[in-house]
Amino acid sequence: MKYDKIGTVIVAGGLSSRMKDFKPLMNIGSKTMIETTIQNYQNIGIKSIVAVTGHRADDIEKKLSDNNVKTIRNHDYKYTHMFDSLCIGLRELADSVDMIFVTPSDSPFVQKYTLKKMIEEMENNSFKIIQPSYEGNNGHPILLSSEAVREILKHDGTNGLQGAIDKVVTGYRNMSFVDPGIVMDADTPLDFFKLVEYNKKRNVPSIELCIKILDYFKVTDEVKSHSYAVAMESLKICEQLREREINLDHMTVLAAAILHDVAKGCKDHSFIGSYWLNDMGYEEIAKIVYNHVKLENIPEVLTEKEVVYLADKMVKGSNLVSIEDRFSTKEDFYKCNDEILGNIREKKNMAISLCEAVFGC
């Protein structure tokens, strides 16, 4: 999907007085916060990005010189508010795009999934303003239609952007996501420490987040029970491999096992599930989910991917079964269809080979 008519305004004109450091240029990992924030929008194909600067404008402009971002200065940043900087950015983009994301520069970890779903919702409906939330708490970015932009630019500034939003009687939509980044910023040193911690772990969702993801996608209790059983068997396989000095990432295995059927009920559920999870930032988990139905080969040294595949083939419903039992019903049902039967037996033989490699069975 192309997003040529969508823009982003990143407000970076403040003094960061509560932080006691300059937030936009503080590093998290290998990039500054403002660079990571910008990258979120570039990663989905948004090219019209404006950063509104004020304090230390020269430093921000130098840092962003190679980022394909337009910078505009709020020369009165010492005497004005964040809303004034926002309006400077909105005026710059108002005539060239149909929607505008607005965000502070210290909101670096919003998921691609969140951004794309917000755009999809505004494209398919007549909402003027869409705001995301996580666990009932509103956050950023906020997506504005061109109509909302015009209304906001007429606002007198009372209570800032929230004051303008409050005036919108119809056309406001709040969307809930399983995306902690929505409500994370760096107003204080403690907030910043939490961002640093989150960055270290954000590629693999916690068990708590996995459960929330299952609930978000309305996974049935039956599928959940199966997934938990697969997760349990996956851990047993990991322990078996550890005895042979093959040390795998247990949290990656657990998350992938719990989420492997997140799209169960959809056509090509392994592809759909991996697509969702990839957009949520869980790339490694997505690869395992994609391959849990069918493996291309068995590597010399087994990985997390093979563990989840085998565990899934050892569980029927929520019960541990033999691989023969796991496939017998489908083999019988498709016994007159050589193509499908061949595919089933290929998966079965792969599972048997893996079982022999792990347990010697």
List the predicted regions and their residue ranges.
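Conserved alpha/beta core of the MobA/IspD/sugar-nucleotide pyrophosphorylase nucleotidyltransferase superfamily
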Residues: 2-4, 156-208
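Acidic/His-rich, divalent-metal-binding segments that scaffold phosphate/diphosphate chemistry
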Residues: 194-269, 279, 319
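Divalent metal-dependent catalytic cores for phosphoryl transfer on phosphate-bearing substrates
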Residues: 242-334
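N-terminal nucleotide-binding beta1-loop-alpha1 segment
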Residues: 1-21
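Conserved N-terminal catalytic core of the sugar/cofactor nucleotidyltransferase
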Residues: 1, 35-99
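Conserved beta-loop-beta/alpha segment of the NTase-like Rossmann-fold superfamily
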Residues: 78-151
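Charged phosphate-binding loop/patch that engages nucleotide di/tri-phosphates or the phosphate backbone
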Residues: 182-185, 197, 337-361
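Short catalytic helix/loop segments, enriched in acidic residues and glycine
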Residues: 24-38
